[in-house]
Structure formats: structure tokens, C-alpha cells
Amino acid sequence: MELRFIEHKEAQDERGKYTRDEYRIGNYVVFRELSVYNTGSTFENFGIRANREVDFLPDIYYNYNLFDDDGRTREFKIQTTSYGSLYPNEIQQVIDGYKEAVEVVNVLTDKFLK
């Protein structure tokens, strides 16, 4: 699965510099936002949007936890849900959606978090 770069935007003010890069991967759009403050601190965030025209495609979230043991846990998580009773072809769509989400998370982790 290929992570394709789409667009780069940047802005600056008296507090620092801000960038936003847009990517596409599979049925997802990924926004990587980076803030570099004049104080020397940085903040990174990811927004990941699933294509809502694809049934059973789970949401992916970026988790940045300052309160874990190491103080800086960064990871992507996949939203799970229960759909109740489904037909076999719908179950296959759920499985395919989770497989795609896992693949996307692996690519994003390799590219941005390692």
C-alpha cells in the first residue's frame, strides 16, 4: 500500500511555524500537522479520515499520551465496533475494512513514528 503525498501548507506567526501535509493511502486521507514553537517545543498531530462511501471501513486515530511510563507514547489505534447480525458478504466487508486499516496503520507507523 502506497502513501501518496498530495499537498503541503505552512504558516508562521509570532509564536512559531506550522505545517500541514496531506496524504492519501488506500481509502483514507491523512493530515500530518506539525507545530514548531519559538520556545523550542514541538507538537505533532495526525487527522485520518476514512472514505465514507466504503462500507465498514473503521476510523483510525492518532494517540499521543504524555502520561504513560515513558512520557511520550505515540501510536495509531483502530476503532472497533459491533455491527450485530450481518450476512456473510457483509462480514467479509468488515474483515476487508479491518485488514486495510491495519495495513494503513503499519505504513503510517513506519513512515512517521519509527
Region spans (language model):
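Positively charged, low-complexity terminal tracts
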Residues: M1-S85, Q93, E100-K114
